[in-house]
């Protein structure tokens, strides 16, 4: 389909910007001359908090795209937020650092889950269904190309001009991705569908009230402790924040019909493996950089 090249390039440029930033983030934080001069523990803690939130927001961004904004609008909003975040990260100021991290976290939530969903909707057309796997293979090639090439740009720009040039390159790359996406919008306009809420769907406010709000409240509890229980207060906050989410899935499993329990159990097992995989994989921005 004509949509594929545009979505391929949009995702390639988005991953170019994201992994360029990830590759230099902790190095930037620890640089005593041109960065923030944080020690290893502080930099790793901030990086870990950032990555955890990056993985949290797609849940919210996907919900909003499904039921409120639509996929195209969400992708454009996400791309713009991330591009601004990368550029603002070039400013050596703690306030701008936290602002840029917030923009990237929010932008990722809007962009990441929705561009792959939009591609899937394009391939749901009867004439393309048989080629869906091939389409996703090509799409993921774009991810790998962007994630690979960005490292050479990041290293070269830092050596020639400094950190700011590398972050600007990430931002410009992201904006190129947004531009490509907008240019190709006519090819996937028909696939941008806001899903009607069915009787079996949990209302958006109920999701926020029964999962996200309790997670936030539980996450705030460790901030009142004098000393961290596990490593740091941010680690404690995320562990406590996971408690309501785990209980929700246990409740979901127990409440489900007997015929659905094996499928839900298999899904939860996959979740556990995926969590372990990404926890190891994301060492590429902290431990692997240190080595």
Regions found by a protein language model. Give the residues of each.
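Intracellular loop-helix junctions on the cytosolic face of multi-pass helical membrane proteins
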Residues: 1-2, 125-126, 155-291
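Short amphipathic helix-loop junctions that connect adjacent transmembrane helices
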Residues: 21-44, 284-291
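Interfacial helix-cap and linker-helix signal at transmembrane-aqueous boundaries
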Residues: 29-30, 64-66, 153-162
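Central cavity-lining transmembrane alpha-helices of secondary-active solute carriers
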Residues: 45-66, 112, 148-150
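Primarily marks hydrophobic transmembrane alpha-helices of the MFS/SLC 12-helix fold
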Residues: 74-75, 136
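C-terminal ends and interior cores of transmembrane alpha-helices
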Residues: 77-98
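Intracellular juxtamembrane helix-capping segments at the cytosolic ends
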Residues: 110-126
């Amino acid at each position: 389909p004509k949509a594929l090249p545009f979505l391929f390039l949009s995702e390639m440029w988005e991953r170019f910007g994201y992994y360029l930033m990830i590759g230099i983030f902790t190095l930037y934080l620890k640089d005593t001359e041109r960065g923030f001069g944080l020690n290893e523990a502080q930099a790793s803690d901030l990086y870990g908090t950032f990555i955890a939130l990056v993985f949290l927001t797609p849940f919210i961004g996907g919900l909003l795209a499904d039921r409120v904004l639509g996929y195209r609008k969400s992708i454009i909003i996400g791309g713009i937020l991330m591009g601004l975040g990368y550029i603002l990260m070039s400013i050596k100021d703690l306030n701008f650092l936290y602002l840029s991290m917030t923009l990237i976290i929010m932008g990722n939530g809007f962009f990441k889950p929705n561009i792959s969903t939009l591609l899937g909707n394009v391939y749901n057309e009867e004439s393309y269904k048989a080629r869906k796997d091939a389409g996703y293979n090509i799409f993921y090639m774009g991810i790998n190309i962007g994630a690979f090439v960005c490292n050479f740009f990041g290293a070269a720009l830092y050596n020639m001009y400094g950190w700011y040039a590398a972050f600007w390159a990430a931002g410009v790359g992201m904006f190129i991705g947004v531009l490509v996406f907008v240019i190709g919008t006519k090819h996937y306009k028909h696939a941008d569908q806001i899903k009607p809420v069915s009787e079996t769907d949990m209302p958006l406010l109920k999701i926020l009230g029964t999962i996200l709000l309790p997670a936030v409240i539980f996450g705030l509890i460790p901030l009142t402790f004098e000393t961290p229980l596990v490593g740091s207060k941010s680690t404690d906050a995320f562990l406590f924040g996971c408690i309501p989410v785990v209980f929700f899935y246990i409740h979901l499993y127990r409440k489900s019909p007997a015929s659905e329990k094996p499928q839900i159990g298999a899904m939860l097992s996959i979740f556990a493996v995926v969590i372990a995989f990404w926890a190891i994989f994301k060492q590429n921005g902290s431990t692997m950089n240190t080595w």
